[in-house]
Amino acid sequence: QGVTERHGDEATFRPVPSAGARHAFETYLYCRRVEALEEGIYRYLPLEHRLLFEFTEPGLAARISEACFGQRFVGQGAVTFFWSVIPYRMEWRYGPAAHRVLPMDVGHVCQNLYLSAEAIGAGACAVAAYDQEALDALLHLDGEEEFVIYLAPVGKHAVSA
């Protein structure tokens, strides 16, 4: 979701479609096995195209898996991407229709992750089954103005026997 073009203070263009170029999502990452990065939660800063370390704590992988109803693979990948939504970024422009385009937009974002993962020989798995309150709390989101909408762990493909 890095910025590819800026139009003053009005809009940014990115390599993923967004209704009205509103880009209502934030990207958080749980980096577990990423070279040169401390294990923990990071936030992606699209204007600077960099990661901001947010926090770490013991047992993050287990807490993430638990918040995803025991899906262990979610917390065990090299990195897990979380997308949160800030609905107001879309609502001020589209009103009630915003809630119809947000799921499509986050799907576009996740599809780009699938394509990127495949390009480097890795795999991704979109996950929408999670405990909303637990995951919002884990990422320190308020659950109202900003909340998790989708996530996807990324890692090496399983080796076939």
Language model segments and positions:
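N-terminal amphipathic, basic helical "cap/leader" segment at the start of enzyme domains
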Residues: 1-76, 161
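A generic secondary-structure signal for well-formed alpha-helical elements
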Residues: 3-4, 117, 156
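Small-aliphatic-rich amphipathic alpha-helix that forms the alpha element of a beta-alpha
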Residues: 27, 81-83, 87-90, 94, ...
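Solvent-exposed coil/turn segments that connect beta secondary-structure elements
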Residues: 32-34, 86, 157
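Conserved hydrophobic/aromatic beta-strand scaffold that supports enzyme active sites
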Residues: 41-43, 80-82, 151-153
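C-terminal helix-cap and adjacent tail motif
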Residues: 56, 147-161
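A structural signal for short secondary-structure junctions
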Residues: 118, 144-146
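Short proline/glycine-enriched turn/loop segments at secondary-structure junctions
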Residues: 137-144
